[in-house]
Amino acid sequence: MTIGFNADLYILPFDHRGSFQTKMFGWTGTLTPEQTAQIAAAKQVIYEGLKAAVSSGVPQEKAGILVDEQFGAAILRDAAKEEFMTACPAEKSAQDEFDFEFGKDFAEHIEKFNPTFCKVLVRYNPEGDRALNQRQTARLKLLSDFLHDNSRSLLMFELLVPAEKEQLERLKGDKNAYDLEIRPRLMVQAIQELQDGGVEADVWKIEGLDRTEDCEKIVATAHQGGRDKVGCIILGRGEDPQKVRQWMETAARVTGFIGFAVGRTVFWDPLIVWRSQRITRDAAVAEIGERYRSFVDIFENARHWRKKSA
């Protein structure tokens, strides 16, 4: 069984479901068909932004989308036809414990679209609830085994390590101190525990890190035990562009980081302005494309520095 994906990977993620519904549109509860169509139409604008970026020079073979089946089925089909890399989430939206969106039918829904990547978002703090971590690991192993034994789709693992209450209390509530001093170590430990539990990610989707040495430790852990082809990408976490740029430049200079997945920082503001009718749809598409392309340029320029200094 070959594990890993190590080609360039520049993902525009817009698989947000619960947060998109409530924070972008202000809707709660069961959606009407008309509301569902409005969300799908907004996601189409994001997708067209990616296409615009490719038309303006982003290499298509490096570009990919991450979008959900609920609001993006048509986008997933079109992107596959257009030969973009695609990713589709398997997790239930907006809950702390990982479980499958479609329960025992998860495999059927993966095979329905055959995305390049099946993505999971998992909150896993090694110093948190041990029983919860074990339950999550057992479900994730089911998915990992299915993908590697029976599917063409690869496993993209988005690892979030939120601070436990006690951890923050030790730092007097300083979340920045947690991100800098505590989270990197816990991320390494989480990857090790998941690997030991039989979860084999092809790509680790990682929260931003401020220090090069922490990026290097993540890659070393992802690669251990003969997993040399496993890739790592940086996620944006909805931060401001300057912070995302800092994380991206730090990661790009470390061999083993193959790209990024930046979503809200790219599309959120243009969609808000478009929905308030302050700009046209075409202008929103263009702005999303320009923002996405700017992050491609940032990553590639930083990586060029790495190669130049090697």
What are these regions (language model features)?
Residues M1-L132, E200, V230, Q242-A251, ...:
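Alpha/beta catalytic barrel-like cores
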Residues L12, F157-E158, W204, G263:
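Conserved, mostly hydrophobic/aromatic
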Residues V45, E108, A138-D149, Q189-E193, ...:
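Alpha-helical scaffolding segments of alpha/beta enzyme cores, especially the outer helices
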Residues I65-D68, T116-R123, D129-R135, D179-L186, ...:
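Catalytic beta/alpha-barrel core
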Residues E83-T86, N150-L155, G225-D240:
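Short beta-strand/loop segments at the ligand-binding rim of alpha/beta enzyme cores
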Residues F98, P126-F146, G208-Q224, Q242-K243:
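Active-site-adjacent beta->alpha loops and helix N-cap segments on the catalytic face
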Residues T137-E193, G197:
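Conserved anion-binding
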Residues D179-Q189, L235-D240, V244, E249-A252, ...:
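Active-site pocket-lining/capping segments in soluble small-molecule metabolic enzymes
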